[in-house]
Design a protein with these regions (language model features):
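General small-molecule cofactor/ligand-binding pocket signal
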Residues: 51, 102-106, 159
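Short glycine/serine/threonine/alanine-rich loop segments
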Residues: 46-47, 99, 125, 156
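Gly/Ser-rich helix-loop-strand patches that form or flank binding pockets
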Residues: 1-8, 119-162
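A short acidic, glycine-rich active-site loop
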Residues: 69-84
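Aromatic/hydrophobic pocket-lining residues that form π-stacking "cages" and hydrophobic walls in ligand
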Residues: 37, 89, 116, 150
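Small/aliphatic-rich secondary-structure junction motif
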Residues: 11-70, 94-96
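Structural beta-alpha unit
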Residues: 1-15, 91-128
């Protein structure tokens, strides 16, 4: 895969892809994005980073007085679910001949968009691969707000997968 940009002298300049980021939320779209990301990582011999962002809030079901769940249990449940998603991506990567991927779960007070962009900048990500929509039920949008925000503000190319 070759990504070219216009240099100052209008000559195409090839961008090296060494680090690829794929944000995962467990949706069908994020898993399709992970499939694309693993293929690109294989072709480019790039490191694949897979992250999930958790905003620090508890859903209504966890906050009822009768519920035995504590905040720490809430985060344990999320971690367990996300690790299953990561395992799925690890298996995809192994099928593509990629022995290891970097996975991280973040609890961040910033927006999911800001967290993804900060991570991409901090890890020197060369390409972000993201699904068109996440887990929200708002299907009226043509493209999810997170994907759109990342696409609009990322410092690097973004591949949006549907």
């Amino acid at each position: 895969m070759t990504i070219e940009t216009e240099a100052a002298d209008d000559e195409p300049k090839k961008i090296e892809i060494n680090n690829i980021l794929v944000p995962i939320d467990g949706s069908e779209y994020s898993l399709k994005a992970a499939q694309y990301a693993t293929r690109v990582a294989r072709n480019e011999k790039a490191q694949l980073f897979c992250i999930h962002i958790v905003t620090p809030r508890m859903p209504y079901g966890y906050a009822t007085p009768a519920a035995s769940f504590t905040e720490s249990r809430y985060y344990e449940d999320i971690k367990h679910k996300v690790e299953l998603w990561f395992d799925n991506v690890r298996n995809m990567a192994k099928d593509e001949g990629i022995p290891d991927i970097k996975t991280e779960i973040f609890i961040d007070v910033k927006s999911v968009i800001e967290s993804i962009l900060d991570y991409a900048s901090h890890k020197n990500i060369d390409l972000i691969v993201i699904g068109t929509r996440g887990r929200t039920g708002l299907k009226r949008f043509f493209m999810g707000s997170v994907a759109n925000g990342v696409l609009q503000h990322a410092h690097c190319p973004v591949l949006v997968v549907r």
